[in-house]
Amino acid sequence: MLELGAGLGLPSLAAAVRGADVLATDWAEDAVELLRRNAERNGIALRAEVVRWDEPAPLVGEAPWRLVLGADLLYERRNADQLLELLPRLGGDALLADPGRPFAKGFLERAAARWEIETATDGTIALHRLRLR
């Protein structure tokens, strides 16, 4: 399992506790370091790496990923653009949680050309499941 934009990595930590082989990634070195320390302190085995979406060789090299997770990623247009380029190269399904960021709607409209998209929402957070066609 791959998490993009992991930040503190709660989804990655939870998946690793349940036995998943996890790579948690973020562009911010300090976030990745905190995630590593948290995993180590709690005896959780996972990998955490600094990766930029515009330099995805480490991620693509391990593709296909069975599952790609991301939460609150679509707050900038460049994130939406880079994610549209990157996701098809990773393979597998993607689960993206979004709190209604401004670029989510456009991202989903463009993604629908290549992906089947299912959305569930509680009125605050939307969870989008993307499957390559």
Residue ranges and their predicted role:
Residues M1-R133:
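S-adenosylmethionine-dependent methyltransferases
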